[in-house]
Amino acid sequence: MTEERNQRKVYQGRVVSDKMDKTITVVVETKKNHPIYGKRMKYSKKYKAHDENNTAKVGDIVKIMETRPLSATKRFRLLEVVEEAVII
């Protein structure tokens, strides 16, 4: 069981929305080579993740893991809050 879970995708990103109950929106930024020119391009993708205890807040750096479909758009769950946001 644990070996299978280790093959699931794990991403690290920043929480941009926590307005939904038990759901957060995480932006994951990655770099990819352009297919023709070879330049490293930065791109980002938003994922909705399940946050059972509503622990993550906007601005936090979190780790999310791929899981079974939890709703029409949720395919990830919160693993841990790596770094909490600094409130000014």
From Swiss-Prot:
One Gene Ontology biological process: translation
SUPFAM superfamilies given in the database record: Nucleic acid-binding proteins
Entry annotated with the keyword Ribosomal protein: yes
Claim: Transmembrane is one of the keywords in the record: no
Domain of life: Bacteria
Keywords in alphabetical order: Ribonucleoprotein, Ribosomal protein, RNA-binding, rRNA-binding
GO CC terms in record: cytosolic small ribosomal subunit
CDD domains membership: Ribosomal_uS17
InterPro entries cross-referenced by the UniProt entry: NA-bd_OB-fold, Ribosomal_uS17, Ribosomal_uS17_bact/chlr, Ribosomal_uS17_CS
One GO MF term: rRNA binding
Family assignment from sequence similarity: Belongs to the universal ribosomal protein uS17 family.
Protein task: One of the primary rRNA binding proteins, it binds specifically to the 5'-end of 16S ribosomal RNA.
Subunit structure: Part of the 30S ribosomal subunit.
Protein name: Small ribosomal subunit protein uS17
Organism per entry: Enterococcus faecalis (strain ATCC 700802 / V583)
